[in-house]
């Protein structure tokens, strides 16, 4: 049975049981705590946790999901994959355990001819929570399953909760017995390779509190409305129904494996044992197939490669796939062959991968191209690092490996492999330490951004009393009432002068940071108190929280207030936000519709806009964008907002940010009608002339395939242009030319400077040659070896010392000779030793001498027997280091 038929039967069955068919949500989760939709129940969390009223009592879906926590295990087992489809049925206070069990059994065991999946009942096993006698009895009563095929497990396996206080309940899991060739008998408890879990039924019936761990919490009572949340892994069921070894060989994945095999000339053998000689290649082909499919689906849902968040996950998937193909022997670009194979396998269920394939493929191919460039440039840098490490007689440092990984995106496994080929080890502990420190910095940064919003329970309580009404679209001041005051994340009854608080009002004109627009600031005043609003956030949907400080008096938890937004700052922010829409429209007009928005930020007087584009903008293009934007401002276009259905907005061609989740009703901002039409919840000027002017600052890369433009608007644009004019005036006075001739004068000056630098370089080399001629006469005998030890003083770099040392070695002839020259470059001592063949035969080795000298200098070094280089931190020890070299040659 094909995957498309499996999902169709699922939906048809549950619709026949009174369920509403709900389309799959985006892979980009609407839950801000999740990067991706990781389970079928994620879109239904607000209903399952009673935060929102469900619009239906019963629902069913086939949900696209992404999980990358076990990405290193992909391809090695039959159970791990990054993209999967979760078939689910849900009840919100309607049916409960018995019907959930009956539905599952009926669909699984009904014959194929009668619309079911036709699984043999004797192949099915069930687990229940060890204390859930009711579930076991319902299985026995409704299915006729023998008691010996029902096994009990503990909380770790068969109990569901969010890990926070709230709803929870036992689960019951259904397993399929693949037969004795896959492992020992004895049910799921004995062997989960033989007994594959296909369906999990979660019975949400309890309220829990005092959660100490996943298995340690207090059950405080039963839920007033009991819910059902089930999930069946479509790929696992397809594996069974299609009688293949693992989920990589199902109809939606196997075509990519076949294409990878054809491109590489390798044979795919379904090897799962690490002892099988084909196992390594088979794992690589499975990784390719899995990751290509995941990348296809992520890009279809609006994710683009970047260095953080969802974009980083996508980038890693693509690069792991490309890397796996290289390990299979394919070094050319391979996505143009692999991605269409995945598209053709998935388009029956997800038509968008075909209709939007031009955009999807453009993004994927650009990322592969960039990665191949990364490998080329990274290889050159790695070869330099390997050369230096070998010269120093040291392993490749973890710092070098980290720099390659962090700066150039060079995979650590590739670094390890290439270092091994060069006969070097890599300091992996240091690399892992640096990676850990980077993660800790990122986590600390994320924690800092969350601030007191890390615990949302107090805000959830306030939200239960009603959402904050936002009045700031039409007014910037108004009366309101305090709904709650928080200090340190806890509700308090009052706050006094100097206290930093979080304030919730019944209604507010203050705009909370959202959609790239910075929050409003201003004052909240009342009877005897003044509170300054510094920031406004929405830690939970529907609740505006004012971060503030009490400047005067005492504010109470039920005070009546006057809320007043800083009008000038809001106007400047509106200039920037409307300016952002104008720049977006200008980019589309000049570059084309493929310049898709990737993100934006605007605050008083300033905007930045990120968009999909693979190369830097020329000066002429930047000027054109700036001109089109300012013409739109001068044309006094009307800016209008409309609220409409999402479908209507899309039909009108309104632009939306890919990856964002929108409700059924959206706010559309139009500039001169269709000239610019975007989904947007921000605030804007009434007409474009109120912006005044826009000054583009330039563009820069913000990750592979993405660019960023920045601009000032309004008075900030004026100040920026005034500062540039002042700079031009200063330069014209300094260079004594009119502004129109500045560029020519600067070019002429730079040409002269380069000529002077070349002359200085020539003179420096002449000085070194002259010095060598003089120094050769200073050679001393050290136990039969002619030795020159010279302190060159300040030098431009190690190359100066190398040239001098090699020149001196040549001048000393074929008799045993060694040269040690040292100097100071950028306040750090450098030493270089060179020996000739006769000296080396006499036991004088440059590498050993440099290590000795560098140790005295407070550093390290090494190299070959004929030439070696080192350095340190203590420039005052240069004479002592040179003396030590001479003494070592004498004592050898």
From Swiss-Prot:
PROSITE patterns: AA_TRNA_LIGASE_II_ALA. GO terms for cellular component: cytosol. Keywords: Aminoacyl-tRNA synthetase, ATP-binding, Cytoplasm, Ligase, Metal-binding, Nucleotide-binding, Protein biosynthesis, RNA-binding, tRNA-binding, Zinc. Gene3D superfamilies: 2.40.30.130, 3.10.310.40, 3.30.54.20, 6.10.250.550, Bira Bifunctional Protein, Domain 2 (3.30.930.10), Threonyl-trna Synthetase, Chain A, domain 2 (3.30.980.10). The keyword Phosphoprotein does not apply. Its EC number is 6.1.1.7. Its cofactor is Zn(2+). One of its GO terms (biological process) is alanyl-tRNA aminoacylation. It comes from the Bacteria. Pfam families: DHHA1, tRNA-synt_2c, tRNA_SAD. Its main location: cytoplasm. Belongs to the class-II aminoacyl-tRNA synthetase family. Catalyzes the attachment of alanine to tRNA(Ala) in a two-step reaction: alanine is first activated by ATP to form Ala-AMP and then transferred to the acceptor end of tRNA(Ala). Also edits incorrectly charged Ser-tRNA(Ala) and Gly-tRNA(Ala) via its editing domain. This is Alanine--tRNA ligase. It comes from Arthrobacter sp. (strain FB24). The gene is alaS.
